[in-house]
């Protein structure tokens, strides 16, 4: 399933992937900050429509140029090679752009199966931590997923998709001050959802937040509370 805005085909293509509410806010703000002039494509999980049936507004409000729903609910947790084949088929049936057409690829929720398509095609990508400080607690993320989806968790850990150490990950985007591990290396990029949201002009901030909430945010403090609320969603179930 897809939703797109009128074509602006002359501009470079940038791809984003997100799964949770926090990650969606994260990639929206990152796009606003670093890729506002490029043509951006967003991949969301098909189950996000349960939480955000208004997902098409991401395009009509010009937050992204194209949005596609990846059919995670239809990919069975079976043998790894079969999962690779299923993911390849899903991507090539749903996304009308060869993966090599993208100048940059950003993945939040990298432990989800879409990342396997990037690995299969040897495509470098940028990794977002799952929520503020979660990079330092990647084993918790693995254990939570393994409790319900052991095959999924095993494959993601094998390819180092919880801790951002896959050789195909060219940078790790995280909130540095929230980490308890060493993130001083060049591959670690500091990004604060809270600060970017606070610093948006009020009109733009409320325009964005109206996608998530029905009422207006009157103060920056309310915006901070919202991001903290999203940060607490880092242990969401796969269906959420």
At which residue positions do the language-model features occur?
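Generic low-complexity segments that are intrinsically disordered, proline-rich and/or Lys/Arg-biased
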Residues: 7, 13, 97-99, 168
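Active-site and donor-binding regions of nucleotide-sugar-utilizing enzymes
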Residues: 15-157, 161
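N-terminal beta-strand-loop-alpha-helix module at the start
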Residues: 2-41, 210-240
């Amino acid at each position: 399933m897809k939703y797109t805005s009128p074509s602006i085909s002359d501009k470079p293509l940038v791809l984003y992937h997100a799964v949770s509410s926090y990650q969606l806010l994260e990639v929206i703000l990152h796009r606003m900050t670093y890729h506002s002039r490029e043509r951006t494509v967003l991949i969301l999980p098909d189950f996000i429509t349960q939480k955000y049936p208004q997902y098409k507004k991401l395009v009509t409000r010009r937050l992204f140029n194209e949005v596609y729903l990846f059919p995670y609910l239809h990919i069975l947790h079976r043998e790894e090679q079969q999962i690779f084949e299923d993911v390849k088929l899903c991507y090539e049936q749903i996304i009308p752009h060869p993966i090599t057409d993208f100048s940059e690829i950003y993945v939040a929720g990298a432990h989800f199966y879409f990342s396997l398509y990037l690995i299969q095609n040897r495509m470098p990508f940028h990794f977002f931590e799952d929520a503020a400080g979660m990079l330092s607690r990647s084993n918790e993320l693995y254990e939570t997923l393994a409790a319900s989806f052991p095959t999924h968790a095993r494959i993601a850990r094998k390819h180092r998709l919880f801790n951002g150490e896959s050789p195909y990950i060219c940078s790790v985007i995280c909130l540095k001050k929230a980490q308890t591990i060493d993130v001083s290396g060049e591959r670690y990029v500091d990004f604060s959802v809270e600060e970017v949201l606070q610093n948006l002009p009020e009109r733009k901030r409320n325009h964005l937040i109206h996608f998530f909430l029905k009422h207006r945010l009157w103060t920056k403090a309310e915006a901070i509370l919202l991001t903290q609320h999203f940060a607490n969603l880092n242990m969401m179930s796969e269906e959420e």
